[in-house]
Every structure is written in structure tokens, then in C-alpha cells.
Amino acid sequence: MAPMNPPRLQRFPATASADQIFAAFKEDGCVVIEGFIPPDQVARFSQEVNPAMEKITVEVTNDGNSNDRTKRFSKCAIASPTFRNEIIESDLMHELCDRIFSNPGEGMGYHFNDTMVIEVQPGAPAQRLHRDQELYPWWNSMGPAGPECIMNFFCAVTPFTEENGATRLAPGSHLWPEFTQINERDCPQFGKIETAPAIMQPGDCYLMSGKVVHGAGHNTTTTDQRRALALSIIRRELRPVQAFSLSVPMKLAREMSERSQTMFGFRSAVQHCDGDMVHFWGNDGKDIAHHLGLEAPSVHI
């Protein structure tokens, strides 16, 4: 059942250990990490994506769909050197991803699904409540015991306030016994879900399981453009929304670290099965990096 008391989000500084943050993630399905991106990186990143964001027109439909008064931009790796050289090199991000997705001795168990700037305009309506794992519809059938398929580091680029529509999350909803579509009237929680706003300053983020019920709030302001950077990460066995290895130029990919190349699909993920090495997203049984002319990895990512 939905929580009886008003929910609250646990908060930790980015200096906290990955184990502390992961414990809160397991308990609530979501947790705020304060100072996840350093202030100077946030400022430079925002400046670097500004030209692209200014070219995007806003569709106003008044029907509450995903395009209503919201700008979206997914070519962060192309537009922003700060993004590809600094933000995605966060050791804390990878330490948490390893705890959520990876198995010992099997390399990176995850890669990027999308990396998107989301800018919610004044007057934007509230988003319907949903779970991100509904992107892969069959996952809900596994309920709370199912493995994580998708998670998100949702980072504030501008302040998140209740007035400008900060995301509303339902802590603990990753443990509800039934994962039905929560907007259907046969859902036990239909119309009863209590949520908490993710109030954040630029550089803060909330880490959220794909099982957690959430939705953007109503931007009731007349001036606030609420900008975020969503780092959506999925299990390596799943196909991502963005075809990064086809859209990001090789010139930029060559400048990335080995683990970032893997995150964007320029290197294969490695898994050991019955003594054999299997390459996900490989080429003729080998790491796709060989086909692309990248240097051999120093370790099996």
C-alpha cells in the first residue's frame, strides 16, 4: 500500500560513501545526492548546451504529454566537452552502478540508455505518475523481486523547487507487491499515492530505481525554466533508446576513457559464461573496439 505518512527523501553529500548511498537506495528506491556534479562543471555544461537548447521549439498541446512545454536534447556528448570529459567520469556514479548492475568478475554490467537535457518551461503541467522500467513493458511482471533494468541519476542544472515542478517521487514504491500500471483503476494505489518533491540545488541529483513511481510536478511559475541532466543507465543486455555509437563522432569517442567508450557502445561489454568470454555488442566474437580501431583495453571493462 502507499505510505500513510508524508514521505521524505533521504539525502547524502557526494562525499558520503557509495555503500551509505546504496543502502538508502535499496531502502527507498531513491535518494538525493547533494553536490553530485561540482558547481564549476554545472555552469560550464549549461553554457555549452545553451546554443542547442535555444534552437529547440516548445510544443504546447495542453494534454499533459511528454512534449508539453518541455525541451529535450540528447546530444550532450557532442555539444559539451565538460560532459564527456568530466561529468560522466564520476567515480561515485560508477561505484553505484557497479553495486546495482554488475556481478563480480563480469566487468561493467551497464551502459547509457540516454543522456538528456530536460528543460521544463513555465506553466508546464504535471507529468503522469509512472515507473521508468515501463520502457521495457514486461519488466513490471517480475514485481519487486525483479532485477534492476534501468536507473537514473537525475541532476539539477537549475534549482528544483516545489513551485517550478520539482520531480515528485514515491519512496518505497519499488517494494510494493504489485507493479500494475499505476494510472489504471484496477491498481491498488490508484489515486492514493503520496509523493515527495525532490528539492535540489544545481549539481544535486536524485538517484532513482526504475521501479520507483514518480513524475514531474506542475511548473506553476511564470519565469522559471527548470533544467536538468538525466543520466539514464540500463543493464548491458538491454537495447538503449539512443544509438550513441552511430551518432557520436569517432573523433570524440577516441578522446574518451575506456569506461566511457563502453558506456556509449564503442567497446563491448564482457561476460564470462561457463568459462567462455561473451562480448555483448561485439563483432565476430571479439570486442567491437577492434573493429573500430580503438586501442585494446587495459582491463576487461
From Swiss-Prot:
Substrate binds at R72, Q127, T167, R226. Its EC number is 1.14.11.-. Fe cation binds at H130, D132, H214. Keywords: Dioxygenase, Iron, Metal-binding, Oxidoreductase. One of its GO terms (biological process) is terpenoid biosynthetic process. It is an enzyme of class 1 (oxidoreductase). It catalyses: preaustinoid A1 + 2-oxoglutarate + O2 = preaustinoid A2 + succinate + CO2 + H2O; preaustinoid A2 + 2-oxoglutarate + O2 = preaustinoid A3 + succinate + CO2 + H2O; berkeleyone A + 2-oxoglutarate + O2 = preaustinoid A + succinate + CO2 + H2O. PANTHER family: MULTIFUNCTIONAL DIOXYGENASE AUSE, PHYTANOYL-COA DIOXYGENASE DOMAIN CONTAINING 1. Multifunctional dioxygenase; part of the gene cluster A that mediates the biosynthesis of the fungal meroterpenoid acetoxydehydroaustin. The first step of the pathway is the synthesis of 3,5-dimethylorsellinic acid by the polyketide synthase ausA. 3,5-dimethylorsellinic acid is then prenylated by the polyprenyl transferase ausN. Further epoxidation by the FAD-dependent monooxygenase ausM and cyclization by the probable terpene cyclase ausL lead to the formation of protoaustinoid A. Belongs to the PhyH family. This is Multifunctional dioxygenase ausE. It comes from Penicillium brasilianum.
